[in-house]
């Protein structure tokens, strides 16, 4: 078909396990040949929110359009990470993703 579904049934497993509301069910559709994501949906049940985006049509929280911040400086920005929980990876290896 040229497409594949990518599903994370509990995106934010650690938050879910600790009863923190920031977890969700993530689903994406990727065009295989170009590895281009064409749509994505994240359902956040604890907050009763649904985020979705379609390539070329924008991103939404429920039905409200959302966009990335227009912040121009790092000092005014908020950065978050999602390091894997494999204790065999050293910090140096993980930090190569952010250089």
What do the predicted segments below correspond to?
Residues 2-60:
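DPxDG-like acidic metal-binding loop motif
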Residues 67-99:
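An extended, acidic
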Residues 25-26, 59-61, 72, 97-99:
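Short, low-complexity, polar/charged sequence segments that are solvent-exposed and flexible
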Residues 27-30, 61-66, 74-76:
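Short, surface-exposed linear patches
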Residues 9, 63, 81-83:
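Pocket-edge structural micro-motifs
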Residues 35, 58-61, 65-68, 86-88:
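Short helix-loop capping/hinge motifs at secondary-structure junctions, enriched
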